[in-house]
Regions:
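Pepsin/retropepsin-fold aspartyl endopeptidases
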Residues: 1-148
Length: 148
């Protein structure tokens, strides 16, 4: 008789994403702010298809200069409910795809992540077998939205 143990591991997909203060961009467009003064952050975000929104940490919030947001209730992965800050005014860029969104603010320097809403808005897909994020191959020339 053979016995064996199957060990399952979950691969994590990360991608280099740029976050931009949306309000700084508006000020730049209105001639009130030089392009070099637009606050940005670029780095690795975990791509989490089980999460809904973008989640940044306090360090990223401060670097982007985002204003204090509102407290909102969230459900964590373990099923517990907690209150967390939600801020607005974040532009997300992956390659030539962009979206505008709010973000949950995680404590201190917790690992940031990007959830389903920004992925859908930018028409991006996760390739789990390769731990890669890429443009939807059905729409390589730009995001396609359905209004049905």
């Amino acid at each position: 008789m053979f016995t064996f143990t199957l060990k399952q591991t979950m691969a994590v997909t990360c991608a280099t994403i740029e976050l931009i203060n949306q309000y700084d961009e508006y000020k730049h467009q209105d001639g009130e702010l030089d392009a070099a003064q637009i606050r940005r952050w670029s780095g690795e975000l975990m791509i989490d298809t089980g999460a809904i929104r973008l989640a940044i940490n306090e360090e990223i919030k401060n670097k982007l200069g985002l204003r204090k947001g509102t407290m909102t209730n969230i459900t964590l992965a373990d099923g517990s409910i907690s209150q967390i800050e939600m801020v607005g005014g974040v532009k997300i860029r992956f390659g030539d795809r962009i979206c505008y969104t709010g973000a949950f603010v995680l404590p201190q320097n917790t690992e940031p992540l990007m959830g389903c809403i920004p992925l859908e808005e930018m028409d991006l897909v996760v390739i789990p077998s390769e731990n890669r994020l890429e443009y939807n191959p059905k729409h390589p020339d730009g995001a396609l939205f359905s209004l049905k």
